[in-house]
């Protein structure tokens, strides 16, 4: 016999407060039901209590069954069985209690009609066993079986397993099997108990379309009850014929098709202990097939394709009949399919900013051992700007001035004008017109630049990533407070007309953006984490960061659109990706790539030697970043700066706070305009609104407000110092005025403890007082890449 030693209750347990609340509600209900003399009395709006002794022998046909959520039955010695149909109609039942009654048997499917049942109390009855099937599929929180004469058998092994796995408190009751006298043995000592063993034997030879396939399911185990096949995924793929019985079941698939691939064939078996099942997939070989679609313009151009075949075919692209060698600008990308049970694969041939040179015939060849297939498509990405092939010789034609001339020399005429000369003259005139237009634009842009150039502050609080970037044409730029209010930077900073076009900004529907929660706030407005649908073809939805514009003035809207145009142009793996804007309704939204680990400064601090001190009791990273990881971070920031420098853009506010960290230690340049609010101590306020990051600025920027690509190099040297100090503030021991004095007098930041001499040499190369003597960003990046690929052996003897 099995006995229950009650240490609370057997099985799952609700929280003490919840269980106490249930008991309290039942006690209060007793007062209301005291006057009820029927077999079952209502308790509250959806409860029923049946406690009159010996008046109930079945639970069928209870009054108000459709609305019941709690049913309490007690002292019913004639209630001995709970069958399949007894609880029919009680679909809303959450709690069932049958105690101190004569319940001897509960059918395996007794709770088929009560899928929401979560609290089951069958204590103090006459139960000798309870099948695992009885509670299968229920989300129980409480199961109470104490006070029942449970027999020690394999049928109760499932209960002991729950006890061993500590499922919601089952361990609180010890189940033991009775031996001789008062000796009790643990239920687990019965080694003959176990779920069935199921194995499917597959055909040894390869299967092709049209073949017949025979599968055999072998079942082993004690007290086997039933077994069968699950073939729901195979409908329509073949004719199925079952054969045999326990312990060996057969299945014949007649005239199989390629649709059988990736479909599960499942065999299951049950006994008193539990259920076991195993699934296999039959691989049907068939030749490759391919389909190509027309080129579509997305973020990159895409030539969509679909390929099928088993085994999966290899792919090769051809362009105008020649093998196409893939690069980082032209490459194959497969799309993740939501369907995992098909052999067909979908993808794109991605082309990054293709030109007329890429116009032509594209052919995809797919091949596997059973055959090959090819498909071709013509793609045109851009009209040819030339009326002739620049590789062909220019034809020369002659038109005589005097039609009466007797000379017929086809080689040369004195007054004839060759076509090549006409082309040259035309190009020269076009160049002159272009230069004239350029000067006009230069003059106008100097007067009405909308990228913060004519603002009263060098770095106003509302400036974001784009507001800190400027296109340089004639070397460095300087900005005095009076210039900021006046004519701007005539002759020094211009907006390149070819970079800004409203048509290139991607517009996102507001209905596709679902805001989740706020990430931060700046003077411009707020930044939210959001889900964006239909943004990328290979993802139904993705997390993004959404910047909402607070100000609604016309100037703010114009700045918004100009910033969007600029950000659309900046496309680099180490610049935070800008997806587009939403201008439907209000507020105006910008959608950026979401970088899950936040800004680089916080990331460095949380992964540094002082992480525990700064965490304030929160979980911290297991250890500080290693030398190789620090070099990788620095190299990525440098790569982004090389890209900006190649476009002649000046950042002006480069710092770790304005870099973001994503999954896999991917670092990108970009901020959402929040850094001046979050890191206000990093900025030095001059006058009313001007805030300068003086600790990152070179002498010429502090003294003369001169910003250039060389001033960005200086700032990068400070960023490198931040990285190797795990996010410390430059000149942290000095006030702003003291820091200005040190920088302008030529003092340098000391070498960090974790910094190898080679890296510090790069920092010093960035901090040369004369801008022309500083390392270029390209050289800095090359040196860091070399160090990252082979990190130097460096031992911090002081640490």
Swiss-Prot record:
Phosphotyrosine-modified residues are: 499, 679, 683-684, 794
Membrane topology per record: Single-pass type I membrane protein
The EC number on file is 2.7.10.1
Gene Ontology CC annotation, any one: early endosome
Q: What is known of its domains?
A: The transmembrane domain mediates interaction with KIDINS220. The extracellular domain mediates interaction with NGFR.
- What's this chain's function? Receptor tyrosine kinase involved in the development and the maturation of the central and peripheral nervous systems through regulation of proliferation, differentiation and survival of sympathetic and nervous neurons. High affinity receptor for NGF which is its primary ligand. Can also bind and be activated by NTF3/neurotrophin-3. However, NTF3 only supports axonal extension through NTRK1 but has no effect on neuron survival. Upon dimeric NGF ligand-binding, undergoes homodimerization, autophosphorylation and activation.
Name assigned to this protein: High affinity nerve growth factor receptor
Report the source organism.
Answer: Rattus norvegicus
Tell me the name of the encoding gene.
Ntrk1
């Amino acid at each position: 016999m099995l006995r229950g030693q009650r240490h609370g209750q057997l099985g799952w347990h609700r929280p003490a407060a919840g269980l106490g609340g249930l008991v309290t509600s039942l006690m209060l209900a007793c007062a209301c039901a005291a006057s009820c003399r029927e077999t079952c009395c209502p308790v509250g709006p959806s409860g029923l209590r049946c406690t009159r002794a010996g008046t109930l022998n079945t639970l069928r046909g209870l009054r108000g069954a459709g609305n019941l959520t709690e049913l309490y039955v007690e002292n019913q010695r004639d209630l001995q069985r709970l069958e399949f149909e007894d609880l029919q109609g009680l679909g809303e039942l959450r709690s069932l209690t049958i105690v101190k009654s004569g319940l001897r048997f509960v059918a395996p499917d007794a709770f088929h009609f009560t899928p929401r049942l979560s609290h089951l109390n069958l204590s103090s009855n006459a139960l000798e066993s309870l099948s695992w099937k009885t509670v299968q599929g229920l989300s129980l929180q409480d199961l109470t079986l104490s006070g029942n004469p449970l027999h020690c058998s394999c049928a109760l092994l499932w209960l002991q397993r729950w006890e061993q796995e500590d499922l919601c408190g089952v361990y609180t009751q010890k189940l033991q099997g009775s031996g001789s006298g008062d000796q009790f043995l643990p239920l687990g000592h019965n080694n003959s108990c176990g779920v069935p063993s199921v194995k499917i034997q597959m055909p040894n030879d390869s299967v092709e379309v049209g073949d017949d396939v025979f599968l055999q399911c072998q079942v082993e185990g004690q007290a086997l009850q039933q077994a069968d096949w699950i073939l729901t995924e195979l409908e329509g793929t073949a004719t199925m014929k079952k054969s045999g019985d326990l312990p060996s079941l057969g299945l014949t698939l007649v005239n199989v098709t390629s649709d059988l691939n990736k479909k599960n064939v499942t065999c299951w078996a049950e006994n008193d202990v539990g259920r076991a099942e195993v699934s296999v997939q039959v691989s049907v070989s068939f030749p490759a097939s391919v389909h190509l679609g027309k080129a579509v313009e997305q973020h990159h151009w895409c030539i969509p394709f679909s390929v099928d075949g088993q085994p999966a075919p290899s792919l090769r692209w051809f362009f105008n009949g020649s093998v196409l060698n893939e690069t980082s600008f032209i490459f194959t990308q497969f799309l993740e399919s939501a369907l995992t049970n098909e052999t067909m694969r979908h993808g794109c041939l991605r082309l990054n900013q293709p030109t007329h040179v890429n116009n032509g015939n594209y052919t995809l060849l797919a091949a596997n051992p059973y055959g090959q297939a090819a498909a071709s498509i013509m793609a045109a990405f851009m009209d040819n700007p030339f009326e002739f092939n620049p590789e062909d010789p220019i034809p020369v034609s002659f038109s005589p001035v005097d039609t009466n001339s007797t000379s017929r020399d086809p080689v040369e005429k004195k007054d004839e004008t060759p076509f090549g000369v006409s082309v040259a003259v035309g190009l020269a005139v076009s160049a002159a017109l272009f230069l004239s237009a350029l000067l006009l634009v230069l003059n106008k842009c100097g007067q009405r630049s909308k990228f913060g150039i004519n603002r009263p502050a060098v770095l106003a609080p509302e400036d974001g990533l784009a507001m800190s970037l400027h296109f340089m044409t004639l070397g460095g730029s300087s900005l005095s407070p009076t210039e900021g209010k006046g004519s701007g930077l005539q002759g020094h900073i211009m907006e390149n007309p070819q970079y800004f076009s409203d048509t290139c900004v991607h517009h996102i529907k507001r209905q596709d953006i679902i805001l989740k929660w706020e990430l931060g706030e700046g003077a411009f407005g707020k930044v939210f984490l959001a889900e964006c649908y239909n943004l990328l073809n290979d993802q139904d939805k993705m997390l993004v960061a959404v910047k909402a514009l607070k100000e609604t003035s016309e100037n703010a809207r114009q700045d918004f659109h100009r910033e969007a145009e600029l950000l659309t142009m900046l496309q680099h793996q180490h610049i935070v990706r800008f997806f587009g804007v939403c201008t439907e309704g209000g507020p105006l939204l910008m959608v950026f790539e979401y970088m899950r680990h936040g800004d680089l400064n916080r990331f460095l601090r949380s992964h540094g030697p002082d992480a525990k001190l700064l965490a304030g009791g929160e979980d911290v990273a297991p250890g500080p970043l290693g030398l190789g990881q620090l070099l990788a971070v620095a190299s990525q920031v440098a790569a982004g700066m090389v890209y900006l420098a190649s476009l002649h853009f000046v950042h002006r506010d480069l710092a770790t706070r304005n870099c973001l960290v994503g999954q896999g230690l991917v670092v990108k340049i970009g901020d959402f305009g929040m850094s001046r609010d979050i890191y206000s101590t990093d900025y030095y306020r001059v006058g009313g609104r001007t805030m300068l990051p003086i600790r990152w600025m070179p002498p010429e920027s502090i003294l003369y407000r001169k910003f250039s690509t060389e001033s960005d190099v200086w700032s990068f040297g400070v960023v490198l110092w931040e990285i190797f100090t795990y996010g410390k503030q430059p000149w942290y021991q000095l006030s702003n005025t003291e820091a200005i004095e040190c920088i302008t007098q030529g003092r340098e930041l000391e070498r960090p403890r974790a910094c190898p001499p080679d890296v510090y040499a790069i920092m010093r190369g960035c901090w040369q007082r004369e801008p022309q003597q500083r390392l270029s960003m390209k050289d800095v990046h090359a040196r860091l890449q070399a160090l990252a690929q082979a990190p130097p052996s460096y031992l911090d003897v002081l640490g």
